[in-house]
């Protein structure tokens, strides 16, 4: 399944390890290290980064959506898969 992370950008749900807030120093360091390694994907369309998505391929994806919004979308997909709708 695919998750919309904003502005028409989508990520495979099975590849997501974590969705975290970008404000902490460790997350800023992780973002900088990913940029140096060529593993940073900026999906913010020039807007403020409001969440960081960590994938199993060691890519770091920046999103302009709040962590809670992405979580709601993931939960909605899981409900549909489980047949709860």
From Swiss-Prot:
Membrane-crossing ranges are none
- Cited InterPro entries: RemA-like (IPR007169)
Q: Cite the Pfam families for this sequence.
A: RemA-like
Q: Looking at the record's lineage, which domain of life comes first?
A: Bacteria
Check the record and name the PANTHER family matching this protein: REGULATORY PROTEIN SSL2874-RELATED, REGULATORY PROTEIN TM_1690-RELATED
* Stated family: Belongs to the RemA family.
Q: What is this protein called?
A: Putative regulatory protein THEYE_A0405
- The species this protein belongs to is Thermodesulfovibrio yellowstonii (strain ATCC 51303 / DSM 11347 / YP87)
The opening ranks of the lineage are:
Bacteria, Pseudomonadati, Nitrospirota, Thermodesulfovibrionia, Thermodesulfovibrionales
């Amino acid at each position: 399944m695919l998750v919309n992370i904003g502005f028409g950008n989508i990520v495979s749900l099975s590849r997501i390890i974590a969705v975290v807030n970008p404000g902490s120093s460790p997350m800023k360091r992780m973002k900088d290290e990913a940029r140096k390694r060529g593993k940073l994907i900026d999906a913010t369309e020039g807007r403020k980064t409001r969440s960081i998505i960590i994938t199993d391929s060691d890519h770091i994806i920046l999103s302009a959506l709040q962590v809670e919004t992405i979580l709601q979308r993931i939960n909605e997909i899981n409900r549909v898969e489980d047949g709860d709708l």
